[in-house]
């Protein structure tokens, strides 16, 4: 995300200021002209016109919210949060920062790090219309598509959880189909041929290939979304389902399968490792080389 945004800003003579809890990660952007802000979110909130954030969980977002409001923030600061968090957390943060004069929107992103690098992310954008109009060019610089989810920021994170439910369900479906094929004499290439012919979309083709190839380890050259992150996100959608009295049976199954992988020490594998749980339940080996 940040590399594409910096490239966009450079074209108009502007620069990106960046911060990361792990400063070495932020420093990678210095080579393309970004400025590393070592003094953290408070300094960014005081000096920047637009602030983007991408944080792991609700606790991290709330902590940054405390720092932004204590800065104090620059007058009319716009903050666009791209994190996957619980909608009530987005609503809470929005109310707090807005009480300090900050204009807040949510635009959580669909896509892994490799998609971000290739500018293939999809954003679920929600906030006041004039704000969205003003910052849309920045978001377009980081995405291939934007889904407009209205004026309430928490609807952006609701959209993200609904979207992630689709993705998690696809992973479970592929895992079960591949296991059934394995046990019934079909080759995994047969499964991939069906996917590529009948269901040619990036999510199903990508995870179908990854699962069929037992390509579950994550590395800098082979990015993915880890089991630990999957548990967090599926946990959020299950919480929202409980709160709204909605049955998400597939989410319950996926959560159980991810928990099994975490218990086996596979927390850093891609969440496509759901297939290992399905295989084990079906009487097949549930291990793969990391």
Give the positions of each predicted feature:
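Glycine-centered short loops/turns at secondary-structure junctions
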Residues: 12-13, 33, 101, 185, ...
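Buried hydrophobic positions in well-ordered alpha/beta secondary-structure cores of metabolic enzymes
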Residues: 1, 29, 48-51, 61, ...
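Helical "substrate-binding/catalytic lid" subdomain
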Residues: 155-281
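NAD(P)+-binding Rossmann beta1-loop-alpha1 motif at the extreme N-terminus of oxidoreductases
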Residues: 1-53, 73-78, 83, 92, ...
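Hydrophobic beta-strand scaffold residues
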Residues: 16, 36-37, 103-105, 146, ...
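Rossmann-fold dinucleotide-binding core
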Residues: 84-168
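Glycine/threonine-rich flexible loop motifs
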Residues: 55-67
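Helix N-cap at the beta1-alpha1 junction of Rossmann-like dinucleotide-binding domains, i.e.
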Residues: 23-24, 58, 129
